[in-house]
């Protein structure tokens, strides 16, 4: 039985396993190694070259040499000492790995999005609810100090009633060395795999899921690039929430230099705020107002993982828990369905 399921001092070491040590997983690994009171005891990946690099990274720290596996089920079966499991694998594998890790009693940090289908999301929520451990999703922007302060300001009535939300993610294409990402059946397409971060901030702001969505998108520039690509390179979607509230979101992957950027804006009766910078402007007044936000020594990924360890120790419900992560993932799926089917799609259809 994982030690965290027994009475334990907050100073006791938390033993960590990381499943998936590719691009995102290796970054999570570097950050979890910096969290006090943590020991990485096991690593798992199908790619032995990546596994060797991750093993060398861990071995050079106070954690010492970790055990390595290419089969996550074998790892979970053999290593009864694992307290928490970090999952950073392709999205279509999240459900089976997370449920298995929860069932053996570990707490789970699963990278976003939760899954590629609404059915798998629901199964993960059910598993998290019945688990002895804690489930936290990798929606790490909830731990970014500026975004967190901005949303607290909105919730306190700082910008008045929320009237409109606007976001966009306009960037260059992702590296073409990750084949699964460009297969929409494996990644969920980029509205689910990437845009879910921003959609999560907006659902956190509103506190409700949208009633319906409609949109349009396709592949206009990166045609068959990389070969076999099925993920969109551009789309736009509008969500309608209760109380006549709308969210406008667009996502482009072929922006030239100077046009790229990411925005998360909330407009209210008293003014508007940019979540990422914690900067707002009062209506009918000139000049920006920056909210007082202390500088963070670490980025949001570290802060999210550090919070996860604290939550696992205390058996406390995370800020980015299974229910909130499910809503944000399914908001992305609602937009995806509306885009694919070129019609208005209601929440109840998911």
Where are these regions (language model features)?
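Active-site rim elements
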Residues: 137-139, 185-192, 221-225, 251-254, ...
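Short beta-strand segments
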Residues: 86, 166-167, 214-215, 248-251
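Non-transmembrane alpha-helical segments in soluble domains
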Residues: 29, 55, 73-76, 98-102, ...
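Predominantly a Rossmann-like dinucleotide-binding segment in NAD(P)-dependent oxidoreductases
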Residues: 20, 24, 130-137, 141-229, ...
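Short glycine/proline- and charge-enriched loop/turn segments
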Residues: 105, 179-185, 287-290
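C-terminal helical cap and adjacent loop that interface with cofactors, partners, or active-site loops
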Residues: 27, 197-203, 210, 234, ...
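Short strand-turn motif at the edge of the Rossmann-like AdoMet-binding core
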Residues: 43, 112-114, 138-141, 169, ...
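N-terminal glycine-/serine-/threonine-rich beta1-alpha1-beta2 phosphate-ribose binding loop
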Residues: 1-110, 119-132
């Amino acid at each position: 039985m994982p030690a965290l399921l027994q009475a334990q001092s907050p100073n006791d070491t938390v033993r960590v396993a990381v499943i998936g040590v590719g691009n995102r997983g290796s970054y999570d690994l570097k950050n979890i190694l910096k969290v006090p009171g943590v020991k990485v005891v096991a690593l798992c990946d199908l790619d032995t070259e990546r596994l060797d690099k991750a093993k060398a990274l861990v071995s050079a720290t106070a954690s010492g040499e970790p055990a390595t596996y290419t089969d996550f089920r074998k790892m979970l079966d053999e290593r009864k000492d694992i307290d928490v499991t970090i999952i950073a694998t392709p999205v279509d594998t999240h459900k089976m790995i997370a449920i298995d890790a929860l069932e053996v009693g570990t707490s789970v940090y699963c990278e976003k999005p939760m899954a590629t289908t609404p059915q798998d999301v629901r199964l993960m929520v059910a598993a998290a609810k019945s688990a002895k451990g804690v489930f936290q999703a990798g929606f790490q922007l909830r731990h970014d100090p500026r975004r967190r302060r901005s949303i607290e300001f909105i919730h306190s009535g700082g910008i008045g009633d929320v009237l409109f939300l606007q976001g966009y993610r306009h960037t260059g294409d992702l590296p073409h060395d990750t084949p699964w990402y460009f297969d929409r059946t494996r990644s969920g397409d980029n509205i689910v795999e990437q845009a879910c971060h921003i959609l999560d901030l907006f659902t956190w702001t509103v506190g409700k899921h949208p009633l319906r969505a409609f949109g349009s998108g396709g592949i206009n520039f990166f045609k068959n690039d990389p070969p076999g690509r099925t993920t969109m390179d551009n789309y736009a979607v509008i969500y309608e929430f209760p109380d006549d509230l709308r969210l406008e979101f667009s996502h482009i992957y072929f922006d030239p230099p100077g046009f790229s950027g990411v925005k998360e804006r909330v407009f209210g009766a008293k003014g508007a705020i940019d979540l990422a910078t914690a900067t707002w402007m009062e209506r009918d007044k000139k000049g920006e107002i920056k909210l007082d936000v202390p500088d963070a020594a670490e980025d949001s990924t570290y802060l999210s993982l550090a919070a996860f360890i604290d939550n696992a120790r205390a058996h406390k419900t995370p800020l980015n828990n299974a229910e909130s992560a499910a809503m944000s993932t399914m908001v992305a799926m609602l937009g995806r369905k509306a885009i694919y089917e070129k019609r208005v799609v209601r929440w109840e259809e998911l």
